[in-house]
Structures are given as structure tokens and as C-alpha cells.
């Protein structure tokens, strides 16, 4: 059912709104018919999160390249890419994207898969959806044969860095990320696919 958002993309968390009920969220694999909804959602959430801190020309260049309909269609068709869509009353409210590809030098695990995107609607923060979606990311990564997950997160996004640390991701180094022609620095974080319980034991 169609929905009414290249190399590693940044991860987004949005503002609190109690209207999203995580118990009514459905998570499924993305399909070809979802390309337009993902393109619109991805551009909007990226712009809301990173637009205020970046030059508009750089942001526009990045959005045109990363979130065009053709690009989303290609990513949905890519056998190395798996997209998870979270819907609430048939509306797209979050999505995650896993991809097999080259690893940064600081990632020591050959079995790692990249969490390329992890985007939430600004009305979903505080609903518990981020944790639910991360659990599904781990399960999907395991089903794809990965034992570790890695991601890149902007060094100037402490809120997202804190979220990933809470989810068990460790900072292992850095890599560059181009927003238009503006070369920026991302922290690289890695976690085992198996989640840790509050005591720190892997389960």
C-alpha cells in the first residue's frame, strides 16, 4: 500500500507531541510504491533538523541529490538496501534504512551493516517510537546476517549522539559528510546487533 522521506545519511529526532501513540504504530518493509512518500518525508525532516544550522544553498543542493524521487526509487530497488517504514493511521511517521556497503576505517567489524537513515517525524518524539524502531532495526540487521550496526551522526548533534549512546552505540571515530559542497564531520558509532539489558549484559 502506498503511503498518504547514496552514502551514509544523518539521523534525526524531532520535537515532542503526544498525539502519536506508539502502540498503534505499524512497521513494514518499504516497497516501490512508497518512493514519493519517502522523498517528501525525508526532505522535510532533514530540512527541519539541519536547515537552521546550515547554509541554505548547501542544504538545497544536498536535498536535491539525496531525496529526489528517482533516488528514492533506486534505493528501494537496491538489493543491498533495506528500508523500514513506521506508519500511524497510514501516515509515514518514521523510517530507517539499512545498507550493506564499504566500511569506514574506524569500523573494525567486517560483519557490520550501516544504519544509513533513522528519521522521525517531529510529532513522534517522546512517543516511544524511536526505541521501537531501533528494536526493529536490530532484528532486521540480524535477519540480514549482520552482527554489528554502524552509523554516522553529525558531531554538532549532541541530542542524537546521546540517543544512540543510550541504545548501546559506542563512538569509534569519525568520517566526513558533504552537505552540498560543505564538508562536515560525523562521529561514527557502532553497536552489536544483540541489544543490552539495563545491567549491560548482551541479550
Q: For each of these PLM feature ranges, what is it?
A:
Residues 151-161, 178-183:
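Conserved beta-strand-loop-alpha-helix junction that forms the acyl-donor binding cleft
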Residues 147, 170:
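Short acidic/polar active-site loop segments enriched in Thr and Asp
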Residues 17-21, 29-35, 40-125, 131-136, ...:
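Acetyl-CoA-dependent GNAT
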Residues 164, 169:
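Conserved active-site tyrosine of GNAT-family acetyltransferases
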Residues 81, 184-188:
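Short hydrophobic/aromatic beta-strand or adjacent loop that forms the aromatic wall/cage
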Amino acid at each position: 500500500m502506498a503511503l498518504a522521506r547514496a552514502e551514509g545519511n544523518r539521523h534525526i529526532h524531532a520535537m515532542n507531541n503526544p498525539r502519536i501513540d506508539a502502540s498503534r504504530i505499524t512497521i513494514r518493509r518499504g516497497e516501490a510504491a512508497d518512493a514519493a512518500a519517502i522523498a517528501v518525508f525525508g526532505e522535510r525532516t532533514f530540512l527541519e533538523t539541519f536547515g537552521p544550522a546550515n547554509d541554505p544553498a548547501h542544504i538545497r543542493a544536498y536535498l536535491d541529490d539525496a531525496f529526489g524521487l528517482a533516488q528514492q526509487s533506486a534505493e528501494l530497488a537496491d538489493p543491498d538496501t533495506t528500508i523500514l517504514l513506521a506508519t500511524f493511521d497510514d501516515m509515514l511517521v518514521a523510517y530507517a534504512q539499512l545498507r550493506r556497503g564499504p566500511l569506514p576505517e574506524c569500523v573494525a567489524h567486517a560483519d557490520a551493516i550501516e544504519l544509513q537513515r533513522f528519521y522521525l517525524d517531529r510529532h513522534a518524539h517522546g512517543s516511544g517510537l524511536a526505541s521501537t524502531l531501533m528494536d526493529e532495526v536490530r532484528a532486521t540487521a540480524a535477519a540480514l546476517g549482520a552482527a554489528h550496526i554502524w552509523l554516522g551522526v553529525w558531531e554538532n548533534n549532541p541530542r542524537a549522539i546521546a540517543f544512540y549512546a543510550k541504545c548501546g552505540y559506542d563512538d569509534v571515530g569519525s568520517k566526513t559528510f558533504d552537505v552540498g559542497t560543505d564538508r562536515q564531520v560525523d562521529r561514527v558509532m557502532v553497536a552489536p546487533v544483540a541489544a543490552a539489558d539495563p545491567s549491560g549484559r548482551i541479550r
